[in-house]
Amino acid sequence: MKPIYSLLVSGLVILTSWQAIEQAQALVPNIDSLQQVLIQETNPVKRLSLKRQIADLSMKTAKLEDRCRVFEDFTALVEEDVYMLNLREKDYLQHYYEYRLDEEGNRIEPHDSIKQKELYYTQEGLQIVELGEGVVELALSPAFFAKYLSQLPAHYQEYWQLSKDSENIAPDACLVLTWRELGDLIARYEAYAKAYPEQKELFVRLSDNYQYLQMVYMTGTDNTPVANESGALDPELKSEWQRFMKAYPNSLTTELIKEFLQRKNYSDLNAMQERVEEVQKTSNHPLLLASSSL
């Protein structure tokens, strides 16, 4: 009798367990149900949250080789909602600095309503980005993408980080990086090409950034010049070039530095820019060959 009783009890336990699992699964939204909710939702922030839930489920079921595609689709889709959010918050963004500065330019505490708004956006993975000339916009923060990036191959994670670190480095034509930070960023691009020589498609995407960074490093920007009014090279930049040559002797950028250090004067900016462009066009560096293959 006991064996039969035990079997009955075991059967009830298993049945109860399956019922609990089915109930739990019913409570967990699937991709189709989330997409149906998304179609009806008009609030950009709530749409971002729904798309994150869809991405969570998609990444769980995707094979490793497919996750990069899932992630790229996700990043494109969420940017649509960020664009709409910036339109919706146009008034707030246009008066962003007025909430923080008085008429004499002194810092003041924003109103509590502004603080609450900004706290809400921060919690939703958004941040304020300064674009220059008093213009700001809402953008997705690194934290928004962090958990997805951690599920991607190392080569893609580094590609993504390089791209992000190169964004908006000179608002108002004023370099926000130090010369050394810019030099090290260029070196990271060159190291990436050596570490992942098979990533030709990503080289194409990185090529324009690499050329721009190299151009700024060698010729400056309108508001961060490489030389003074008399054409003398900025001493800080000269020291940085010398450091870069020593740290990265085999770099294409080092070849440019060696040539530029032989110049007596740095007033002819057009000639310097043309020389950088000429070297970039004739170089066989993988990041530059990728550009010429387009």
Regions found by a protein language model. Give the residues of each.
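Bacterial Sec-dependent N-terminal signal peptides
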Residues: M1-S33
